[in-house]
């Protein structure tokens, strides 16, 4: 076997959409053309343009494009040659690198680049083919991702057409090749032109930016058309790997290792192989050898002699692995990974499979019925119940093809640092590259993985669409089957819920469009290729209606309104979070501003002020601000008194408080099983739902959620007659803990002190009640223990109290390697004490913390030599609080 990578330098040219693949010769003739002034297309005359547009056009045009974006947002290709492009990559990235367009996320540049979708894009690459390659049985062109509408021309001959960014292209092109120099031409369009003649079956709800319906016909990331949290950014390009593969003989083309059961220290596993033989009209004997290695040592070797036929063949073997090292989610144990290798020898020809990292672990989804008629919804790994803590993953960039591998590792590592155990792969995004799933397996992050359909009804009445849906489901379930991080496949995002709840007649379609995909094609593919991974037809799902709180995973957006069961208004009555009946919340969220460095980056030199249209363009629109401002005003301070810097600070704190509130509420419920925020990361810089922004900077809310998700956690809630204390231990270690509880005033006086000694089992939660005084106007209940953060009973109603003025100060700064250890202290209760350096991207092990009277707290500042400054974001009591007579001490 030989492989020829086609990654690297290509040539790129834009043409009008009506320049089809059949006209490739006239496009290629421009390869070495001399510069010629750009001309208007035939349907436009110069006098048709405004005076401003005429003046702009009559300037010396760009040698590659004449771009008129101020009004018409059109681009007219010139007759001058091609520009360089690096593949893999996106057309827009090449245009940025060649100075033709600006970075779309600065200022309001997304508005200027919409013309990119209106052109066809021609990519050209020459390559050499050897005689040895052509002597092989099969010579394939493999392209992992084509976005989107692709015509592939090899040496002037049309070789293939492809319309699915979610399914790799792989075709034998041997018949088109010859020894020596060959040429590959790929004509791409973004897919937009395919929308207009289609009959739409879809309605999209609540998006300010998205195309309302016909996006559903393009099997590419749906968010690129815009959503309620991102601008539309046209995408078009070649993603991930592109190569020519020449081979004869037999090779493993798919494999996995299933963990069937655990028996003490041993594990029963089953190897599965799909083997391709290149000669279609003969059989041949094959020696299949496969091994499992752990930490460099071989722990199992298997061998099979197979008689292969042409095309695909299958093999399995069930074995017992002695003293198996199990894979666990983050915080529950080690992420032990085995190296899985295999090779085939046929007629003396050896082909080795690319090694894979696999984990030995069992996984199940428990949906058993409870006595009250409701149902569980929790995951068990290796027989242990897992509380799924995490967030919704969206693509890392609107130009998703340009995301470097390092960004994936950073985001997964940051999730693990925040004690995440799960990402939900949102269905409006994409199936990520292999490195992402490798990092999730390495860091112990489970995946609730949507198939890539979202918030729309999909045209399953079209046979060509069903064909693509089936290919995609088969390809992705097979590709991802061996990763231990895969916890559940879900059919789509919110489509079942939309059918039952969103659309009244006559808007509601006459049937559930998409059911052939979500209820038949996808579950069959999962069962064939990954049978031990559960499948759920949609997210949310279960119950008579898809989003029933007492049945399965819920998307908790209904709690933004006055919910019929909890009877509370989101963000204003926080104690009612404890009454949410959900078992598993796989979406809920609140907005929070970014750090100032991020805002200044996309403002790109313009002034940071509320009325700056660039700021509004990046998510600061009125509907979002009304929610943020209302929450700040209710819980922290009067938002009208805040300048831009204060708004960034208090907005971030508010988001963190609300995320922590629901996280703690879900974790202390006996039936609580999961809490996934909407969203974890972002595809562009905006004021939004995330705790990590587009530039991979931690937002303020990151630290609040990290504390709420701690593997060892105390939670205390005021209740009738005192307080209820929850002790959570997700670690595999058992220990004895002395839990110190009581009442404390804001100035440090204590009362009703008690100590409860608990034997804390691994992977457990315990609760107990304490009787304490109930004057919560001047103080709070607390619980503390060695190895735990102190918990107090104050919710987010900070404006209901008059706190004493803080005297917080830095007591000590020590160097610890590349880090600083900073010890801070205050003599009074001090919420929201935080360290800051001149670089707001610096990482801390904790920040925006509560200081308890006279208790020092040491914070680690990572990779920092600059001594930070201590600040306090003091809450301001409301006018009603000020009027109340709370000035006398309870004592």
What are the language-model segments listed below?
Residues 11-20, 86, 223, 234-237, ...:
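Substrate-binding clefts and catalytic carboxylate motifs of secreted carbohydrate-active enzymes
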Residues 4, 11-17, 59, 63, ...:
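Accessory beta-strand-rich segments of carbohydrate-active enzymes
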Residues 442, 459-546, 696:
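Active-site neighborhood of glycoside hydrolase catalytic domains
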Residues 97-129, 134-142, 147-155, 160-163, ...:
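Active-site-adjacent substrate/metal-binding segments within catalytic domains
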Residues 305-325, 742-777, 841-866:
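Intrinsically disordered, low-complexity Pro/Gly/Ser/Thr-rich segments with frequent PxxP/GP/PP motifs
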């Amino acid at each position: 076997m030989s492989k020829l990578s086609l990654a690297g330098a290509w040539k790129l040219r834009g043409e009008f959409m009506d320049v089809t693949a059949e006209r490739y010769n006239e496009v290629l003739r421009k390869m070495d053309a001399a510069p010629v002034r750009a001309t208007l297309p035939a349907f436009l005359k110069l006098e048709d343009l405004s005076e401003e547009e005429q003046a702009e056009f009559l300037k010396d045009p760009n040698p590659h494009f004449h771009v008129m974006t101020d009004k018409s947002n059109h681009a007219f290709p010139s007759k001058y040659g091609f520009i360089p492009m690096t593949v893999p990559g996106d057309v827009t990235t090449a245009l940025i690198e060649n100075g033709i367009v600006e970075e779309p996320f600065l200022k309001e540049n997304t508005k200027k680049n919409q013309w990119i979708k209106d052109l066809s894009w021609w990519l050209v690459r020459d390559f050499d083919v050897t005689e040895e390659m052509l002597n092989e049985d099969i010579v394939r062109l493999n392209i992992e991702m084509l976005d989107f509408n692709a015509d592939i021309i090899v040496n002037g001959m049309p070789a293939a057409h492809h319309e699915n960014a979610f399914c790799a292209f792989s075709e034998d092109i041997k018949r088109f090749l010859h020894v020596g120099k060959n040429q590959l031409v790929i004509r791409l369009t973004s897919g937009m032109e395919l929308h207009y003649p289609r009959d739409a079956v879809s309605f999209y709800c609540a998006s300010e930016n998205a195309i309302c319906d016909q996006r559903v016909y393009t099997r590419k990331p749906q968010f690129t058309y815009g959503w309620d949290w991102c601008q539309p950014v046209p995408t078009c390009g070649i993603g991930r790997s592109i190569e020519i593969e020449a081979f004869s003989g037999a090779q493993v083309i798919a494999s996995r290792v299933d963990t069937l059961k655990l028996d003490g220290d041993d594990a029963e596993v089953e190897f599965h192989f799909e083997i391709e033989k290149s000669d279609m009209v003969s059989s041949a004997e094959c020696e299949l050898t496969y091994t499992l290695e752990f930490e460099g040592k071989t722990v199992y070797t298997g061998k099979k002699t197979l008689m292969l036929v042409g095309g695909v063949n299958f093999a399995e073997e069930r074995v017992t692995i002695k003293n198996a090292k199990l894979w666990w989610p983050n915080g529950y144990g080690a992420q032990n990974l085995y190296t899985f290798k295999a090779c085939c020898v046929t007629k003396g020809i050896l082909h080795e499979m690319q090694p894979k990292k696999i984990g030995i672990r069992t996984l199940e989804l428990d949906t058993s019925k409870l006595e009250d008629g409701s149902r569980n919804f929790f995951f068990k790994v290796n027989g242990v119940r897992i509380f799924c803590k995490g967030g919704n993953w969206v693509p890392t960039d609107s130009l998703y093809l340009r995301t470097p591998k390092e960004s994936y590792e950073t985001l997964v590592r940051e999730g693990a640092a925040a004690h995440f155990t799960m990402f939900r792969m949102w269905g409006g995004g994409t199936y990520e590259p292999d490195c992402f799933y490798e990092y999730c397996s390495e860091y112990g992050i489970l995946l609730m993985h949507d198939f890539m359909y979202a918030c729309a009804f999909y045209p399953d009445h079209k046979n060509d669409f069903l064909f693509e849906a089936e290919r995609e489901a088969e390809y992705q379930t097979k590709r991802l089957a061996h990763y231990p991080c895969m916890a559940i496949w879900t059919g789509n995002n919110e489509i079942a819920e939309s059918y039952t709840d969103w659309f009244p007649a006559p808007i509601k379609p006459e049937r559930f469009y998409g059911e052939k995909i979500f209820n038949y094609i996808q579950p069959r593919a999962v069962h064939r290729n990954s049978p031990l991974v559960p499948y759920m037809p949609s997210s949310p799902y279960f119950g008579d209606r898809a989003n029933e709180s007492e049945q399965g995973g819920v998307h908790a957006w209904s709690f933004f309104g006055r919910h019929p069961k909890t009877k509370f208004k989101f963000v204003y009555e926080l104690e009612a979070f404890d009454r949410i009946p959900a078992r598993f919340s796989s979406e809920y969220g609140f907005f929070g501003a970014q750090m100032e460095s991020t805002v200044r980056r996309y403002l790109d030199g313009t002034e940071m002020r509320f009325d700056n249209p660039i700021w509004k363009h990046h998510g600061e629109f009125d509907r979002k601000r009304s929610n943020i401002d209302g929450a700040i005003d209710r819980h922290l301070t009067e938002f009208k008194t805040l300048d831009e810097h204060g708004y960034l600070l208090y907005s971030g704190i508010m988001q963190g408080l609300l995320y922590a509130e629901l996280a703690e509420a879900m974790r202390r419920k006996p039936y609580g099983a999961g809490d996934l925020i909407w969203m974890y990361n972002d595809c562009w810089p905006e004021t939004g739902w995330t705790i990590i922004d587009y530039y991979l900077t931690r937002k303020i809310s990151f630290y609040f959620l990290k504390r709420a998700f701690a593997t060892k956690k105390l939670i205390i809630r005021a209740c009738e007659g005192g307080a209820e204390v929850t002790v959570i231990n997700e670690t595999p270690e058992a220990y004895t803990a002395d839990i110190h509880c009581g009442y404390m005033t804001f100035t440090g006086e204590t009362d009703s002190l008690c100590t409860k000694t608990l034997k804390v089992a691994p992977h457990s939660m315990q609760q107990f009640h304490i009787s304490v005084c109930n004057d919560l106007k001047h103080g709070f209940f607390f619980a503390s223990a060695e190895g735990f953060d102190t918990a107090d009973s104050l919710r987010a109603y900070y404006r209901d109290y008059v706190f004493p003025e803080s005297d917080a100060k830095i007591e000590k700064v020590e160097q610890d390697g590349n880090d600083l250890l900073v010890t801070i202290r205050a003599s009074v209760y001090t919420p929201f004490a935080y360290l800051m350096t001149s670089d707001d991207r610096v990482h801390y092990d904790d920040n925006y913390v509560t200081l308890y009277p006279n208790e020092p707290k040491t914070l680690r500042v990572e990779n920092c030599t600059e001594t930070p400054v201590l600040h306090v974001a003091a809450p301001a009591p409301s006018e009603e609080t000020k009027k109340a007579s709370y000035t006398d001490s309870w004592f």
